[in-house]
């Protein structure tokens, strides 16, 4: 489930954003009254999307965005502001926010912004799935090459792609050989012997 954090010092504004989010779908929604509280929530919760006001006590939205980018570069961020000040918008864009929305928030504009955020998340998830498939393919490829050839360079490639140690790979190799009891396989000694 997507987790969203709304950060605004005005409770009424947080309720308004929560209402608009409920129209978009079912999400886990967290709230904070300022940037400092938001960092505390982020330290103990995985958050996918951050909606933040600019002007808040203790830590403003731009300071929060900068801090979030350092620890959570993948997070989608939308900034809300009652100030039509280009310098705020420019700084927000420099930190990679998806959008800078002026208050009062127009529901249609919010919907378009939210759709863009969800498209970004879907795109990142799809890229991660593709990357995982490629890594799985390469692991299998180099493992089979190592099993058939016993060459050290194939083993080195396999080690680079996996977190497993040489002992783990050797144990798995023996398991494959045992399961292939009907086949005659030749294995060379470990490349490190």
Model regions and ranges:
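Short hydrophobic/Thr-rich beta-strand motif most characteristic of the beta2 strand and flanking loop
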Residues: 26-33, 41, 89
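CheY-like receiver
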Residues: 39-134
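Interdomain helical linkers/hinges and coiled-coil/dimerization scaffolds
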Residues: 105-188
